[in-house]
Amino acid sequence: MSDADGLATYEYIANHIGSCEEDMDFLIDNMARVDLTGQFVISAARYLFAIDNGRFADAIGRLVQLGIDKDRERRYLGAMMEQFYGADYAARADELSAADDNFRRIYKRLFPASAM
C-alpha cells in the first residue's frame, strides 16, 4: 500500500477493522514511518479505543506513544484526553498520572507549566 502521510493506513484500518487485526503491527509500523505530525496515529488510537479498548489495548498503547512523540505542536493530543480519561481528567490528573504513564506524558506535553 502506498501511503504518504498515514491517511491511507488509517483508512485501511477503519475499512477493514474486522479483518486487519493480525496485520496491526505492520500497519502501525507503517504509520510510524510516514505520519510525521501524529495526526493519523492519534486518530487511529481514538478509533480503536471507540471500537474496543480492551481488544486493541496493545495497538492503542503503541499508537498513543507514537502520537506523544510526533505531535510536537500539540494539535491532536488534546482530543484524546477527554475520550480516554473522561471529562474530569484535569481534576484527577495526579491520580491518573500515578496510574498511567501515557496520561502523565500527554498531560505534561499539553500543560508544561503544571506543577505535576
Region annotations inferred by a language model:
Residues 19-31, 53-65, 87-96:
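Amphipathic alpha-helical scaffolding segments comprising HEAT/armadillo-like alpha-solenoid repeats
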Residues 87-116:
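Eukaryotic acidic, Ser/Thr-rich intrinsically disordered low-complexity regions
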